[in-house]
Amino acid sequence: MMQSSISSGEAVVRLSRPQVMVAACKSRFRVLVAGRRTGKSFLCRFILYQKARQNPATVCWYVAPTYRMARQIMWKELKEHVPTHEIQKKDETDLRIELVNGSIIALRGADNPDSLRGVGLDLAVLDEVQDIDPDTWLAVLRPALADRMGRALFCGTPKGFNWFY
């Protein structure tokens, strides 16, 4: 497997060639379909942090099928990935990190779509998207990206013929 090294703050992050292709893609809406244990969540974390770090005052969300899954999949690793000196505030209850540049990275669950309303987003990363109700994307998250021309990354694993197929 070919790997590339990319700077992520102070650390150098090693991404595989497919991960680099997804991270570097300029499309507004990106889709990553890959098997289990292929580094999808690692890539999600990298993309969230890069967007927030490089673009002051942006709002970036990581959305998993449930709030509990968001915490289990991403929270510990995200806190370890973001350098301490770049963190203005960390909210363990709301699963939210505010960077010194004013950007916000927050983890959310798609199991309560009404709790996702009312916020404009610059980036939405939907992980395990095959298990998220398509109406949550269409009626809630997609409109949240509209006024800011926000981007989205859909990541998931094949799971039959569903909206992610």
Predicted regions and their residues:
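Phosphate/NTP-binding elements of NTP-utilizing enzymes
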Residues: 1-165
